[in-house]
Design a protein with these regions (language model features):
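S-adenosyl-L-methionine/SAH cofactor-binding core of RNA-modifying enzymes
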Residues: 63-113
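Structured adenosyl-cofactor binding patch, chiefly the S-adenosyl-L-methionine
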Residues: 116
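N-terminal nucleotide/polyanion-binding subdomain common to many enzyme families
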Residues: 1-78
Length: 116
């Protein structure tokens, strides 16, 4: 099983996945993990991945272009991944969801940035 993340701070995952039970399972080959930097699919010199909401308001929104380009590129590398896009208003992650994901060959977790 391959777990992948698409994030603006991909280096945050390795310390957790190299330690304790997760680290032992990874070293034993139970699963593999790759983290991808969303900024690798940007085209401006500042590698911008977010922008202010067009209708106004507080906070920032993820720009769709880098996300779509990354998903297209990563999906072309091997088996098509099961994509999970985290959202504050999404479906709660529970045991049933964990069991469903465990049956997938490849899972790509798209990690946005949220205020607060």
């Amino acid at each position: 099983m391959l777990f992948e993340t698409l994030s603006v701070i991909p280096e945050v995952f390795d310390p957790y996945l190299d330690a304790s039970i997760m680290g032992r399972a990874r070293r034993a080959g139970v699963f593999d993990f790759l983290s991808h930097d969303l900024r690798d699919w940007t085209h401006d010199r500042h590698r911008t991945v977010d922008d202010a909401p067009f209708g106004g308001g507080q906070g920032m929104l993820m720009k769709p272009a880098p996300v779509f380009e990354a998903l297209d590129d990563l999906s072309s590398r091997g088996p098509r991944p099961h994509v999970v896009f985290f959202s504050p208003c999404g479906v709660p992650y529970d045991q049933r969801a964990a069991e469903r994901l465990a049956r997938e060959e490849r899972v790509l977790l798209v990690c946005g940035r949220y205020e607060g």
